[in-house]
A protein has these predicted regions:
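Intrinsically disordered, Ser/Thr-rich regulatory regions of eukaryotic membrane-trafficking proteins
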Residues: 1-183
Length: 183
């Protein structure tokens, strides 16, 4: 199975759920040990996952704010809400706009190395889903959206769970395992 781990981070940046999935070593004889099942790595502690979630939350916020803006045409409308001035006063400074004004500004959406691919999905409520998979796995965006749908059904609709609290719901764990292992 090419899915290594799933982390869910609240809008405040705290880790509310993490789960690693069993992987096998290249010989296939027994499960590999270590972070994400990679050889030569150590297993992360719960504290390490908390630090990882907080760090990623900060980096995601920074990358969301450094989305580049390009100079707007002189013929563009002066009341365009996606355009801003360099000095922020609306004076004679040149105008700048986002590359695609109608598209929402996002942070990191995907990151890939030779060992894993990180796919990120941020819901409208600000909850971030981090999915670590094998780099050769196709359609990780569809997979992470399917995970989000099950999260909405089994966690968000649970009357005993409150937003930003840790997720400890057996029905969610079962639905997640069934979705990932029956694909």
């Amino acid at each position: 199975m090419p899915v290594f781990a799933l982390l869910i981070i609240s809008k405040a940046g705290s880790l509310i759920y993490h789960k690693t999935f069993p992987t096998s070593n290249p010989s296939g004889s027994q499960p590999a040990t270590g972070t994400l099942g990679l050889p030569g790595t150590t297993t992360l502690t719960t504290n390490d996952y908390l630090v990882l979630a907080g760090t990623f939350h900060g980096v995601h916020a920074i990358t969301k704010n450094v989305t580049p803006k390009f100079a707007a045409n002189a013929a563009s409308s002066t009341d365009d809400p996606s355009a801003s001035t360099m000095n922020g006063t609306g004076g004679k400074a040149s105008k700048f706009r986002y590359p695609v004004p109608d598209a929402p500004v996002t942070g990191i959406e995907s990151m890939e190395s030779s060992f894993f691919r990180l796919t990120v999905f941020q819901s409208l409520t600000g909850t971030k889903f981090l999915l670590f998979t094998d780099p050769s796995m196709p359609n990780t965006e569809g997979l992470i959206k399917g995970i989000y749908e099950r999260f909405a059904d089994h966690v968000c609709k649970n009357p005993f769970w409150h937003i930003d609290n840790p997720v400890r719901i057996e029905g969610w764990d079962r639905a997640l395992s069934q979705f990932l292992f029956r694909r």
